[in-house]
């Protein structure tokens, strides 16, 4: 079913406003971590402190092509460094929404890297598995080139996780109380499927009387083989035995999962209705509690669980979709999906209806891309009321 846009925005705002300020659900997020360096490629050095930049990717490409068979030297200037990685960005957004967050990832060797200092100040607890990965983002007027140094992600293993948290007992303590758990960036974290399998076999059985929400972000699985994707989806089925798995996808990821599962992308009047039907198909095939898809302009979700936090109410089976909060000239786009995921998971942790959680996710992302800042719950509610008119 689709929902009238303004009414849904108002209902989502009211649901957020009804959450007491003292309500702070616990969340655990892992396991990646990146330092993103934003870099200029110098065209002309004018002085020690002044230079002009290479304006476009095409200009840089022409210079590189001209150097073939010869050699060339390019000066790179780091303008600033910022927090990166699906986990840290999502964790930071959850903190802004008032959650008590434990962030686990490759956040620093021996000491937490300074780029993660704002997250370390806001989170309840930080657990580092090693030095962060690095992305060099060369920015131009017509786009950006991102060069990743991913070797540190090899430190994200089940054995290293055990060592960092104090063994099996420590890992059980880590997962015993959070209302929401998020394990993200599966594509780059090559051992994450194995970690899920160990958790399902050795840690989760008998651990809790309740079923936490377990958010999954595959993060561009096109880079992985079909066999790897199917193995990951099978591991999620094992996690589902002990938790309500929330599979979060963007449109490209949703289409790829449909392809891997031999499902046909639906034809519908609107993009969000097509995505809603796709979410229903994927959820029914995988037998997960939730499958959510956020598109550039809209979003959709399918569920089969009593969504109210008390499990005493809430439709146990359904789907929803809605138009979103697209803006022509965003201030920032990197991290927009992570913010949507944080807002959506926050809503679910508060027992808010999934259709309204879509708009809370959209408002969280919408505020972020317009301001480059993670919104509070109150700011997300204001955004929703403004959107409703």
Question: Model-flagged regions — what are they?
Answer:
Residues 1-70, 75-86, 96-319, 325-327, ...:
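Ribokinase/PfkB-type carbohydrate-kinase core domain
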Residues 94, 256-259, 330-354, 358:
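Short, small-residue alpha-helix embedded
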Residues 92-96, 346-350, 363-370:
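Short glycine/serine- and small hydrophobic-enriched flexible loop segments
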Residues 86-89, 341:
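Short glycine/serine/threonine-rich phosphate/pyrophosphate-binding segments
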């Amino acid at each position: 079913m689709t929902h009238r846009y303004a009414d849904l925005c108002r209902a989502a705002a009211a649901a957020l406003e009804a959450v007491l300020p003292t309500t702070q659900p616990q969340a655990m997020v892992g396991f990646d971590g990146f330092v993103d360096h934003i870099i200029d490629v110098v065209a002309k050095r004018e002085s020690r402190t002044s230079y002009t930049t290479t304006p476009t990717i095409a200009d840089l490409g022409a210079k590189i092509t001209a150097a073939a068979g010869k050699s060339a030297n390019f000066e790179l200037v780091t303008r600033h460094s910022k927090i990166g990685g699906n986990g840290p960005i999502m964790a930071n957004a959850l903190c802004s929404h008032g959650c008590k967050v434990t962030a686990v990832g490759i956040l620093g060797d021996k000491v937490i890297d300074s780029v993660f200092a704002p997250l370390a100040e806001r989170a309840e607890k930080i657990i580092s598995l090693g030095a962060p990965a690095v992305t060099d983002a060369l920015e131009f007027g017509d786009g950006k080139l991102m060069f990743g140094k991913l070797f540190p992600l090899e430190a994200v293993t089940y054995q290293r996780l055990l060592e960092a948290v104090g063994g099996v007992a420590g890992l059980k303590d880590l997962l015993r109380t959070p209302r929401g758990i998020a394990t993200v960036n599966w594509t780059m974290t090559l051992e994450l499927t194995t970690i899920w399998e160990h958790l399902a076999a050795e840690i989760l059985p008998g651990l809790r009387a309740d079923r936490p929400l377990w958010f999954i972000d595959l993060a561009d699985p096109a880079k992985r083989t079909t066999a790897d994707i199917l193995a990951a989806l099978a591991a999620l089925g094992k996690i589902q035995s002990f938790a309500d798995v929330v599979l979060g996808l963007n449109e490209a990821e949703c289409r790829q999962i449909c392809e891997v599962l031999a499902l046909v992308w639906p034809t519908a009047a609107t993009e969000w209705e097509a995505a809603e039907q796709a979410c229903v198909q994927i959820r029914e095939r995988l037998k997960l509690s939730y499958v959510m898809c956020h598109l550039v302009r809209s979003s959709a979700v399918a569920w089969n669980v009593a969504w109210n936090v008390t499990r005493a109410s809430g439709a146990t089976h359904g789907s929803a979709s809605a138009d979103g909060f697209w803006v022509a000239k965003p201030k920032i786009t990197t991290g927009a999906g992570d913010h949507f995921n944080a807002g959506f998971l926050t809503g679910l942790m508060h027992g808010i209806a999934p259709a309204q959680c879509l708009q809370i996710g959209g408002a969280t992302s919408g505020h972020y891309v317009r301001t480059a800042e993670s919104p509070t719950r109150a700011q997300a509610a204001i955004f929703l009321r403004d959107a409703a008119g």
